[in-house]
Amino acid sequence: MIKNSVEIDFCRFALEPSFKKDGSIHSWEFLTKNVKKKHCNDYLANEVGFCFTSLSDKEKIDVFKKQILTIERLDTSKLKSKPVSLNVDSLISDCILNDKYIGDYLKNQKNIAFEINEHFHEFNTKCSMVDLKCLSKLCPVWLDDFGSGLTSLTIIDMFNFECIKIDKDYFWEIQSESEFFNVINKVKSYCNFVIVEGVETIEQKNKVHSVVDCACQGRLWMSDYYYIEI
């Protein structure tokens, strides 16, 4: 069984949906909005979302364990049988790959995807992506925040990500450029589906949805978030 440690006393999670052109949900991203440490009266939170850098490594792993144990408690009718993506950085990857119980548990969950952080260690070395390949044997592997960090066309050519998410700031940078559609279609040629983050207006939504197999995620749908506390 997965050991749920006592580093974190309370978590508030949010599932943020991404939407396809027909208005249906493509997937949910599992976000940590705030936490309460043991023997601490204040929540660690801010308006734009929780930052893992404020936690120790043990606390980060505890939050991750709470995330995966929470998924099986979610209301399936609200999820509409769509996948839930978990954010995975180098620390969490190491936790998954070196804990048999966690690995076996995740492998048996049919609705989980790994959303790989843009600073993942294997992107820096451009090696044979051994860890990513091992992760992909457990759950589908997606790339988060393309256009920032260590992401590049070289990276997505080296590993077959099922889905690629476009970084919010990168989207806002290129949305008005004539090359926008070329960039999105180029990225899409390397995967099955693209999700553009940071969509806040109807105009942006329409532009993204004009690209085939491209979904939107952002503040435009804040009322559709699914919150859960443990």
Question: Which positions does each model-derived feature cover?
Answer:
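Bacterial c-di-GMP phosphodiesterase EAL domain
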Residues: 1-107
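Aromatic/hydrophobic pocket-lining residues that form the small-molecule binding cavity
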Residues: 64-67, 128, 180, 184
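Short, well-ordered coil/turn segments that N-cap beta-strands
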Residues: 79-84, 108-112, 137-140, 162, ...
